[in-house]
Amino acid sequence: MMDIRFSLHPTLLRAFQRALAIVLVLGLLLSISPPRPTQAESDPAPPPDAARVIELITSLSGEEPFQTTRIYDRRGILLADIDDRGRRTIVGYNEIPDIVIQATIATEDRRFFQHQGIDYLAIVRALWQNTQSETIVSGGSTITQQLARILFLSPSERYEQSIQRKLKEVELAQFLETYYTKEEILAMYLNMVYYGNQAYGIAAAAEVYFNKSLSELTLAEAALLAGLPQAPAMYDPFRYPERALERQRTVISLMQEAGFLTSSEADALRAQPVLFHPYQRPRNRAPHFVNYIRDILIERFGTEGIHRGYQVHTSLDLRYQALAERIARAQVKRKGKKYRFSNAAVVIIQPQSGGILAMVGSIDFNDKKIAGQVNMTTVPRQPGSAIKPIVYAAAFERGWSPASIIWDLPVYYTLDGRRRYAPRNITGRFYGPLRLRMALANSLNVPAVKLLQAIGIPAVLETAEKLGIKAWRQPQDQYGLSLAVGGYEVPLLELTHAFATIANQGVYTPLYPITEIRDGAGRVVFQAKPRETQRQAISPLAAYQLTSILSDARARRMMFPRPSPLDTSQITAVKTGTTDGWRDNLTVGFTSYLAVGVWIGNTNNKPMRNAVGVYTAGPIWHDVMEAIWADESLYDALGYADGVLPQGFILPPDTVTIPVCDWLPGKFTPRCPRMVEEVYPASLPTSLPTGRDRGYCLPAGAAPSPPEAYFLPLPKDTRSAAAARNWVRKRFLRAVQHLNDCDTTPNKRPLVKQPKLLPPRQWVLSAEKMKTSVHLQASNQYGE
Amino acid sequence: MKSAFRFLSFLCAIWFLAACANNIFQITQSAPGEIDQAASTPTPTPTPYYYIVKPGDTLWTISQKVGVDIEVLIQVNELSNPDVIQPGDRLLISKKVTISGKPLPTPTPTPIPCMQGCIQPPEGCVVKGFRARLDGMKLYVLPEDAIYPVQRGETWFCREEDAIAAGFVRWTPSGPKIP
């Protein structure tokens, strides 16, 4: 019964009384007309569960009721609610405690279980009371009428005081009573009605005002909530607690009148204090990630569709998130002034599951000075040298190997017929013949550009796409040779994803930031299936070859002298990047179970000062890796709950290791200073170089060897070949002869002394023994 | 014979010295600080100065795309009512300032056609097909759709029928209707 006390203009009041009288008469007439279907009486529907309530409301009102969507981290910690339209969690009839039902019925509609939708007794009484007091004391609306109003009338119609509206309402209420059970009507009502403070439905109300689930509500609390729907703004417990408590007293009295409480119970209840525990929104501890998830949800379910009460379980681990954020912030604080950078971003990916464990889009979401709200892990930026492994991956896919030789000598390319592009190394020097291992490990630009030129831009674009880089979607002719040195923008997330694919033996797993989605009724609507969607992006051998180079601390010594943040306590593969004009610094690295990408720079693209990836982003990457290893309790998120992480990387089957002659960049001599082992497919290309492949013989290890092991070929094109020949002549004063037919028999080598064979590299690990920890000795081959 | 031997050892010595010199030279040359800055790019991506507003863009989506704080966008463009931006509006993204404090003459306005790495549609073809990042579902959107600009376009169609024939489902604000 309406219980709003406020004075009304006498004419309005009279109009209202007249309206009520007409309603009464018409209602009597209408109540006779629709007979209740016999089927409903003989076989009453069971009390509706949550799914049924949603179904009923959807079919009646024509749209699915909105509900709070919740986003959880991987361990079930609530990250954020999506409740822009209001908070609601739909519950089934049996989940609603009796005390709530009793309090509601006593307050709103005492004869709910007896009447047929219209309570004439109540209307008569309301009419009489209103006439007596000259104000509206109560209206005679039943719960069914109120539900009809909520379900069928538009918000503007709902509050209109007109005869037409009232008539429509009566008709609709009787329709509801005819086709639906009392439990269904009550369940719909308790889930739809507004309790104030964005709380729709009783479950949301319990949460908003008491931070409790329905079953935890006390009688006093239930009585308080039951009083709110009449005038949620007027009785707002947060703004007017004394009014809300007074209202609660009224509800208790009404419950007593209705016989739900004895007088002593009611007195005890009145004496009981009611404590409000306002619902605390979860502090958004991963705002960029939550926005990213929201984006994905909107993309699939639509802007309206996301308000369907989904339970979204994500791959994010708040412990990893907090760790990455703390380390990134500390580095910006420590080195930001020196190198003039103000922001950092970190992303951590689990390669086997495609899960994102952490996404730090900026060091402070709320800092406007650094445009903290911009997610720097998803904004495309130039990757610099960090892109080179993708180029090498494409090359290894096409028959090149880490031992293949490339000549680092001055070269230029003519672009669009006129401009010249002459790639240069960062040191400004050229290093002569190099094995690809040395070229990549020391991040030399000229060999990367030459390699790209040799294999072609389409090949690299194709490999990049397979590995997980989706940003390069322009037509192929839009890309130039600067692709090899990171001239084309890639988001950090995609770059790290590509590294994760390499870490996972070349097996691409789509990113699965969302692991599972359940709808409001608890049904699974989406489940991440990494195993079923994986595909081999590059061969396991190519992935291993890349990994072995990127984890070869010996090979990169020339450019990355000790102590370097790239050297970690466990075996890792890593690459840094620095872009033109010191704008972006990157370090992306991985183990077999973890890929971490770090970006450092200024969101507004302002150049830094003399900042190179290894000393700005490198320490963040290093510290994140070490912090994860140091805490065994974190290993469960990586799939190793037993506390033992695998070491190194898996050597693919059907491969052989062969010693090849090796030298430091720029220090080539025909007498090999040392031999190192390279991995080759078991089916070796063993054809001997022919007379046309001009070049120099090198000492070989054991036969059979691939030609590149004992033969240093000159470049194919004549201009480069001449430059290469000159380079050799200048250095070796014609001491070296061209040998067109290198003799590979062990005792007939062209040079006198067989050089010492280095012990196996750090990264070599026996296959399928991922879990066995391998003891490794630090080796000291380069005389450090 | 002897002189030949002397000559050879002389050659060897020179070679040795040259090698040594080379080594020393290299050690002094490898500056550890400067590592891997990418070489100058022949086709550099132009620094964005202006952004042309596309249908469905909001300041928020633009700020995400261009990596500039929404507040900055409002301030720099002196937007009196940031809720109202029209397709075709030109938004200043970055201002180049000379040492004297005078803004540089702006180069030819460079619209950023596809910041997210999407492909330009063929003339008159605006039906954009994409795969949802959640589950790879094939969906298509039309320019009036709210999410139209933020999608990474994958496939362009000139008519809706073509998209449907290719297995794409219409995206709607309340989620795609699956036939």
Question: Which residues are covered by each model-predicted region?
Answer:
Chain A
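Soluble, non-transmembrane domains of envelope/secretory-pathway proteins that act on or interact
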Residues: 27, 33-48, 58-59, 72, ...
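Extracytoplasmic
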Residues: 64-69, 73-77, 86-88, 96-102, ...
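Short pre-catalytic segments that frame enzyme active sites
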Residues: 54, 70, 78-89, 204, ...
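Active-site beta-strand/loop architecture of penicillin-binding DD-peptidases
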Residues: 294-297, 342-385, 390-394, 465, ...
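N-terminal type II signal-anchor transmembrane helix
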Residues: 2-72, 89, 111, 131
